[in-house]
Swiss-Prot record:
The lineage of its organism: Bacteria, Pseudomonadati, Pseudomonadota, Gammaproteobacteria, Enterobacterales. SUPFAM superfamilies: CcmK-like (SSF143414). SMART domains: BMC. Belongs to the EutL/PduB family. Keywords: Bacterial microcompartment. One of its GO terms (molecular function) is structural molecule activity. The two proteins produced are among the major shell proteins of the bacterial microcompartment (BMC) shell dedicated to 1,2-propanediol (1,2-PD) degradation. Overexpression of the gene gives large amorphous intracellular structures; when only PduB is overexpressed large circular bodies are observed which contain concentric rings, whereas with PduB' overexpression internal bodies with regular straight-lined structures were generated. The N-terminus of the long form (PduB) is required for correct formation of BMCs. May play a major role in binding the enzyme contents to the shell. Gene3D superfamilies: 3.30.70.1710. Homotrimerizes to form a pseudohexamer with a central pore. The trimers pack into an array. Both forms interact with shell protein PduA. Artificial BMCs can be made in E.coli by expressing pduA-pduB/B'-pduJ-pduK-pduN-pduU-pduT (in this order); pduT and pduU are optional, while pduA, pduB/B', pduJ, pduK and pduN are essential. A construct with the reversed gene order does not make BMCs. Ethanogenic BMCs can be made in E.coli by targeting pyruvate decarboxylase (pdc) and alcohol dehydrogenase (adh) to them. PduP(1-18)-Pdc and PduD(1-18)-Adh strains targeted to the BMC (PduA, PduB, PduJ, PduK, PduN, PduU) make significantly more ethanol than strains where Pdc and Adh are not targeted to the BMC. Has 2 BMC domains which can evolve independently of each other. This is Bacterial microcompartment shell protein PduB.
């Protein structure tokens, strides 16, 4: 079967699924709630907010030292900052931060994507939220930590790599800062690792729906030299969602040829 025939076959399956959503079986063991997942571990430090999936830790600094603010070269100086950092995950954390700034009086002042994934093919993340009141910043980090149980839902991995999809009907300031996504419009993020899988996913997404390319990153151009290809798209919410789902299906199929069936650790939300 040629690659075009494979794409056509998967797109037909995706369109059928979108038109007639499948009934998902109720799992025997309910997954932990976002509240439980955020509070898996704790400590007595006032700066500590919580932990979450992806070796993620949330911290706050109520009154940042001015010398550190100068050295960090943040776009805006805030007295209080929130820190969302992880060994594994970039898209889930950016999407979670996007929800955090929608829900709180905070702003994303820095997003960095270190080469990490604990030796895997992708990124970790370091996201800084700023605010004039430490209670606002802490609340923003709390929201982001809770959102990670949702935003990790469409991350699928096996021993060979991973694929990741993110979708929102209304992009906010974190997606705008990270990728240049138009604020207020639907946005999708499509990631494939190894990068070869990501390139095919990107092509499939663009062929499956009428969407606009916002950004494209590859190992030597914008991914901190991770073995990933990343496509960010915008457009009508239905079209963006269809494009993301099409990319997910072909990505799972190809990644599965390199190892075991790719699995997600949280329920899919797209």
């Amino acid at each position: 079967m040629s690659s075009n025939e494979l794409v056509d076959q998967i797109m037909a399956q995706v369109i059928a699924r979108v038109a007639t959503p499948e009934q998902q079986a109720i799992p025997e063991n309910n997954p932990p709630t976002r509240e439980t997942a955020m509070a898996e571990k704790s400590c007595s430090l006032t700066e500590f907010v919580g932990t979450a999936i992806g070796d993620t830790v949330g911290l706050v600094i109520a009154n940042v030292d001015s010398a550190l603010l100068d050295a960090m070269k943040l776009e805006k100086r805030y007295r209080s900052i929130g820190i969302l950092g992880a060994r594994t995950g970039a898209g889930p954390h950016i999407m979670a931060a996007d929800e955090a700034v929608k829900a709180t009086n905070t702003e994303v002042v820095s997003i960095e994507l270190p080469r990490d994934t604990k030796g895997g093919a992708g990124h970790g993340s370091l996201i800084i939220l700023g605010g004039n009141d430490v209670s606002d910043v802490k609340r923003g980090i709390e929201v982001a930590l809770k959102e990670l149980d949702r935003t990790f839902g469409d991350v699928y991995a096996n021993e060979a790599g991973h694929i990741e999809m993110q979708y929102t009907a209304r992009a906010s300031y974190a997606l705008e800062k990270a990728f240049g996504a138009p604020i207020g419009r639907a946005c999708g993020v499509i990631v494939g690792a190894p990068a070869s899988v990501g390139v095919l996913m990107a092509d499939t997404a663009l062929k499956s729906a009428n969407v606009e390319v916002v950004a494209y990153s590859s190992p030597a151009h914008g991914t901190s030299f991770s073995n990933e290809a990343i496509l960010v798209i915008s457009g009508d919410s239905g079209a963006v969602r269809q494009a993301v789902i099409s990319a997910r299906e072909i990505g799972k199929t190809v990644l599965g040829t390199l190892g075991s069936e790719p699995k997600n650790d949280r329920p899919s939300y797209i």
